[in-house]
Amino acid sequence: MTMTWDEFREEAASRAGMHAIGGDVSARLAYLALGLCGEAGEYAHAQSVGDGDTACISELGDVAWYLAMIEHATGLRATWPTTDEWPGPLGMAERAGAVAECVKRPMQGRDLPAERFQLALDGVAA
């Protein structure tokens, strides 16, 4: 079955109860940002050591899940690029770090800049 990104996000959110995170929004976003960074790193590692398509697809699926959960939690939506704009595994990991940088701001008592956060999400999707 083929899903749109919106369908995937809603399906992932409906199943997220098994990954329920307590606390306030900042704590949930911090968890999701750490997960996104971790999975992007695992994807980059799988690519670099040649773990094969199955491992890479599994890690990329995990990246997609965390990105969907961040979108669900914030109400922001990533803008998906065309295939020829794909930054590669290291570019994706770098952009996941940009999302984490945005998410940690509220934990430091600073505002979460919606425009900057949107650009970071778009970067991970790219």
PLM regions and their residue ranges:
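Flexible "arm" and connector segments at domain edges
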Residues: 1-126
